[in-house]
Amino acid sequence: MPEGRIVLAATPIGNLGDASARLRELLAEADVIAAEDTRTARRLCAGLGVTPTGRVVAHHEHNEAASTQGLLDQVRGGATVAVVSDAGMPTVSDPGYRLVAAAVSVGLPVTCAPGPSAVTTALALSGLPTDRFAFDGFVPRKDGERRRWLTSLLTEARTVVAFESPQRLADALAVVVEVLGAQRPVCVARELTKLHEEVVRGTAAEVHAWAAERHAAEGIRGEIVLVVGPAAPGAEGEASEADAVAEVAVLVESGTRLKEAVAAVAGAHGMRSRELYQAVLAARG
């Protein structure tokens, strides 16, 4: 019996011309194609001129727990299971990592057919440092959670990449300006590799001004990747006590508990939480 395996197969993020020969071969010959959306997978195959010989089955966040065991059983039986997301690399903010973890835990083979990724494409185009970076998934939706996330980046020495919805982009950038400062370097990458690809680079204030104007005039559409540059060297500890107290107040007003806000701001600036807490209480009178 041939040895089964799982293959994580990266798919184009917008331009079908980026599909590799290996991806075409996998889609044509895999025994099973585990797809985030079976309709999207079938459209991809049609666009590439590929006729799958295997079954196309759903494997997404809502059925991942249930479908994982079935896919592992197929691999045990000698099947090649190709895992594809709607766009880009499976497991990167997409379904698949639980399947990989489960396969690894029982010793089943897992390999990868690498290819396009919105994360690394946006990073490369941003013009921001690429030697150290972090991917933070999606920008938090709720204002308080978003502010806490941005507060954690006050002294972040790495470039940070995150996904954002076009409808929330202008509001998110306004909070970037408020929390990280108008001069923090930022990049917004929209519709990467597609016909209307757009990359906007500048300070947080400049990019926010672009987003606010575009949102008001015609709306912002398409897939968005937000890239936030690292803090300026020596940023840690630069904030005065008054600045830190003000940052705590902003977080508390947005719904963060006082002790959590103090811990976040103190950690970002290398301050002692107890001393900052006392300063906040003193400022409140």
How would you label these PLM feature ranges?
Residues 3, 79-80, 159, 163-285:
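A contiguous loop/helix-start segment that scaffolds small-molecule binding in enzyme catalytic cores
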Residues 27-33, 107-111, 159-160:
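Short active-site oxyanion
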Residues 1-60:
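Glycine-rich, flexible N-terminal cofactor/catalytic loop recognition
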Residues 36, 110-115, 162, 188:
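General beta-strand structural signal in soluble alpha/beta enzymes
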Residues 97-156:
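Class I SAM-dependent methyltransferase SAM-binding "motif I" and its flanking Rossmann-like core
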Residues 83:
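Acidic/polar, glycine-anchored loop/turn motif associated with catalytic or activation segments
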Residues 57-66, 139-142:
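Conserved helicase motor
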Residues 91-106, 173-177:
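Short Gly/Thr/Asp-enriched flexible loops that form oxyanion-binding sites at enzyme active sites
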